[in-house]
């Protein structure tokens, strides 16, 4: 069992129940899933670029990513419908808690010129999205084997009803939000 999951049940749940005065433990917000997405526009010219991105995302998440394809053709970007343009992975359960632990304790502190996470990146329904400019902040990615520094999007989906509840949930996990 992940340490962060135990921490959630033992510390975060009672803290949030008291703060928001919930009647039941089931009302307390929880993290449902974490989605990692890597858009690789250069994959149109060179197919190996997408293979390298898939390998990086697999190392970061510990799970095989799915390749995403263009939904419709866009002449301005020289993209046709069905072209592979990225990859994504959805983490749930044990892998989600392990990734969240590594994100908070290892990856976020390794971000260059880091001044805190943007507290306005909530979507209005309690989900938080953040972008990472370099995949090399994760220790699983071998720096010598990286062909190009790419970023990725991280979306944390919660079942919180409001942004305030979700912010309190993530702050309880020691997410370093900007003041």
Curated annotation (Swiss-Prot):
Per UniProt, the keywords (alphabetical) are: Ribonucleoprotein, Ribosomal protein, RNA-binding, rRNA-binding, tRNA-binding
Q: Which PANTHER family match?
A: 60S RIBOSOMAL PROTEIN L11-RELATED (PTHR11994)
Gene Ontology CC, one term = ribosome
Classification from the root reads: Bacteria, Pseudomonadati, Pseudomonadota, Gammaproteobacteria, Alteromonadales
Keyword Metal-binding listed: no
Output the HAMAP family linked to this UniProt entry.
Ribosomal_uL5_B
Q: Which InterPro entries match?
A: Ribosomal_uL5, Ribosomal_uL5_bac-type, Ribosomal_uL5_C, Ribosomal_uL5_CS, Ribosomal_uL5_dom_sf, Ribosomal_uL5_N
Pfam families hit by this protein: Ribosomal_L5, Ribosomal_L5_C
Stated role: This is one of the proteins that bind and probably mediate the attachment of the 5S RNA into the large ribosomal subunit, where it forms part of the central protuberance. In the 70S ribosome it contacts protein S13 of the 30S subunit (bridge B1b), connecting the 2 subunits; this bridge is implicated in subunit movement. Contacts the P site tRNA; the 5S rRNA and some of its associated proteins might help stabilize positioning of ribosome-bound tRNAs.
Q: PROSITE patterns annotated for this entry?
A: RIBOSOMAL_L5 (PS00358)
Highest taxon in the source lineage: Bacteria
The subunit structure is: Part of the 50S ribosomal subunit; part of the 5S rRNA/L5/L18/L25 subcomplex. Contacts the 5S rRNA and the P site tRNA. Forms a bridge to the 30S subunit in the 70S ribosome.
A Gene Ontology annotation in the biological process aspect, one of them, is: translation
Question: What SUPFAM superfamilies does UniProt report for this protein, alphabetically?
Answer: RL5-like
Q: Tell me what gene encodes this.
A: rplE
Q: Which named protein is this?
A: Large ribosomal subunit protein uL5
Recorded GO terms, molecular function? rRNA binding; structural constituent of ribosome; tRNA binding
The answer to whether the entry has keyword Ribosomal protein is yes
The Swiss-Prot or TrEMBL record describes its family as follows: Belongs to the universal ribosomal protein uL5 family.
């Amino acid at each position: 069992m992940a340490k962060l999951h135990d921490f959630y049940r033992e510390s975060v749940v009672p803290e949030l129940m008291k703060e928001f005065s919930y009647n039941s433990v089931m009302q307390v917000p929880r993290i449902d899933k974490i989605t990692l997405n890597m858009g690789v526009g250069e994959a149109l010219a060179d197919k190996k670029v997408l293979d390298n991105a898939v390998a990086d995302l697999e190392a970061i998440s510990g799970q095989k990513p799915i390749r995403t394809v263009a939904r419709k053709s866009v002449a301005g970007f020289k993209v046709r419908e069905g072209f592979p343009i990225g990859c994504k992975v959805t983490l749930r359960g044990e892998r989600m808690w392990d990734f969240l632990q590594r994100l908070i304790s290892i990856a976020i502190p390794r971000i260059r010129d880091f001044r805190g996470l943007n507290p306005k990146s909530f979507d209005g329904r309690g989900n938080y999205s953040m972008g990472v400019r370099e995949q090399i902040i994760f220790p699983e990615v071998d720096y010598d084997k990286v062909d190009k520094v790419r970023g990725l999007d991280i979306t944390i989906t919660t079942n919180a009803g409001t942004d305030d509840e979700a912010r309190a949930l993530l702050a309880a996990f020691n997410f370093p939000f900007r003041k």
